[in-house]
Every structure is written in structure tokens, then in C-alpha cells.
Amino acid sequence: MDILDSKWNCSVCIDSRQGGRPENQDCYACADTPIGFAVVVCDGMGGGPGGANASTLAVQAILQHLNSCQPSADVQAALKNAVGSANSLLRQTVLDHIELQGMGTTCVVAVVNGKTATVAHVGDSRLYQVRGTKVLFRTADH
């Protein structure tokens, strides 16, 4: 578990557990970007081929996209484009490496700027907003 603080006045806790699988395919990163403090968590799907690669590539692609944004960029559009960019990279990687057919990852991204957190997510990795002991918000699996 990591607890991280940033200049954006937020604390982040990321919990990564291997569970019953032979390999932990989680990848996560936090970074100050031009549009806010970004937290990205990806989990390779189902222990399948290339899951660890998929989660790592997705985190890197998302942060690269967010870091290329102008400070005035629309955060919602930036998140949509960042996740789309990661998806395109994963699709191309599978085309280039047929042995990775079926690889994929879940994804949760939050960008905090001031008192606003903008969230994008795909799959069953969750984001929780907690204040004290109360869960204020949780993403729904899809």
C-alpha cells in the first residue's frame, strides 16, 4: 500500500494484491501533470497472456498523454483521449505480437485539480472517495 501526497492537496492510497493468481498484473502511477494530479491504476485481465504488459503500457500511455496537455485543456476530454490512446496502443501491440492475443487491462484514472476530481474507468478496478470512515463515492464496475 502506498500513501502519496501532492501539491494538489489530496492523499492517495493504492492497494495492490496478487490474489489467487500466479502473477500480479497490477501497474499504477501518480504524477503531477499540467491539468492536475493524476492517479492511474491498471490491472491486467484475468491472468491472461500479456496482462502485466497491458497494464504497464496503459499506465505509461495515459500519463504520457496527460503530461502533453496544456494547463487550459478540458480535463474530461483529456481523460477520454488518454484512455483511447492507451487502447489504440494495446490494439497495435497485439497486431505486432500475435502471442499477446487476448491481452487486456482494466483502468481507473483520476485527475484532481483544486476541489474537483475527474474520473475515467474501464472494467472492474474501483476508485473510492473516502472521508474519515465514510465512503462518499465508488465507481461502478462495467
Spans of features found by a protein language model:
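PP2C/PPM-type serine/threonine phosphatase catalytic domain
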Residues: M1-H142
